[in-house]
Amino acid sequence: MVNLGFVIAEFNRDLTFMMEKMAEEHAEFLGANVSHKIMVPGSFDMPLAIKTLLQKDDIDAIVTIGCVIEGDTEHDEIVVQNAARKIADLSLDFGKPVALGIAGPGMTRMQAEDRIDYGKNAVEAAVKMVKRLKEIQ
């Protein structure tokens, strides 16, 4: 069984809540276990929580769940680009998959509502990566 940790952004919680529920349902469908969940204020705050979970022996992969909606400035792009870069670095540093389930940047609230399956897709990617990495070890 694949043990997952979820790191979930509270910002835009109405959307990340739906993303989280879809992700949980898909994890159960795939036979994966969500053994740890941590809420963080926003997507930019995820890396430290991810690092902490990756240090646990009972975590095979991390699923990130966040939603960054476009504003009047380029803030959304800065948040997602920096978070994604650090998330990828952590995956490589710890040798464990960290799946990017962050919707955005550059999307409206309506587009965000259409993309609530990003959490589900991240679960799919995390479980596949764990299984495929085990095949080559």
Swiss-Prot record:
GO CC field: riboflavin synthase complex
Enzymatic reactions: (2S)-2-hydroxy-3-oxobutyl phosphate + 5-amino-6-(D-ribitylamino)uracil = 6,7-dimethyl-8-(1-D-ribityl)lumazine + phosphate + 2 H2O + H(+)
Listed GO MF terms: 6,7-dimethyl-8-ribityllumazine synthase activity
Coiled coil start-end: none
Record: residues binding 5-amino-6-(D-ribitylamino)uracil: F11, S43, F44, D45, C67, V68, I69, L100
Active site, renumbered: H75
Biological or metabolic pathway of the protein: Cofactor biosynthesis; riboflavin biosynthesis; riboflavin from 2-hydroxy-3-oxobutyl phosphate and 5-amino-6-(D-ribitylamino)uracil: step 1/2
Oligomer status and interactors: Forms an icosahedral capsid composed of 60 subunits, arranged as a dodecamer of pentamers.
Protein name as catalogued: 6,7-dimethyl-8-ribityllumazine synthase
Organism: Methanococcus maripaludis (strain DSM 14266 / JCM 13030 / NBRC 101832 / S2 / LL)
